[in-house]
Amino acid sequence: MENSRSDILLIGMPMSGKSTIGKALSEKIKYTFNDMDNIIEDKYKRTASNIFETLGEEQYRLYERECLEDFSGRDKLILSTGGGAINDKSIEISLSFKYRIWLQASIEELIKRYVDDEKERPLLYNTNNMEVVLTDLYRTRETFYMNCSNIVMNTSSKTINQITDELITKIDELN
């Protein structure tokens, strides 16, 4: 994976594995891992849910775009985005990352992961029908993910190690 620049952007739905895979991949290839939501929370001294509640989703998306701009073009960096970070206002800057990996998982898998991790995500969805919410979000975001990514990886029914090994192979194939 030797290149003049080798930044990696991880995109996909909430619970598709962006943070988990990003951390594991960074350990294997010795890149710096950054989580967009954590960066925004640290920078603005507020939780993501508080920003959404008080300033609105549009403001949060602006913060995400700033984060993409700040981290684009860095060498040996992995940036895990929020699920909605790739949109009509950010797609252009997203394309400046060398490797843009779309982590996919079925809606059923996303729901299972949410149930398994609900204590960590209590404010993620305020709904009685998560399947409908996730399906609607996916339909809204799928085109952006597709147009942004140059690597697609299904994360359902695979171990973290299998996913990271497959990603390293796919990255090497692009070189």
Q: PLM ranges: what are they?
A:
Residues 97-142:
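A glycine- and Lys/Arg-enriched "phosphate-lid" helix/loop adjacent to the NTP-binding pocket
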Residues 10:
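Hydrophobic anchor at the beta1->P-loop junction of P-loop NTPases
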Residues 36-93, 120, 135:
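ATP-dependent small-molecule kinase phosphotransfer cores
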Residues 13:
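P-loop (Walker A) phosphate-binding loop of NTP-binding proteins
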Residues 16:
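ATP-binding Walker
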Residues 27-38:
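Post-Walker A helix-loop "phosphate-sensing" segment adjacent to the P-loop in P-loop NTPases
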Residues 19:
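Walker A/P-loop
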Residues 1-5, 24, 28, 112, ...:
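NTP-dependent small-molecule kinase module
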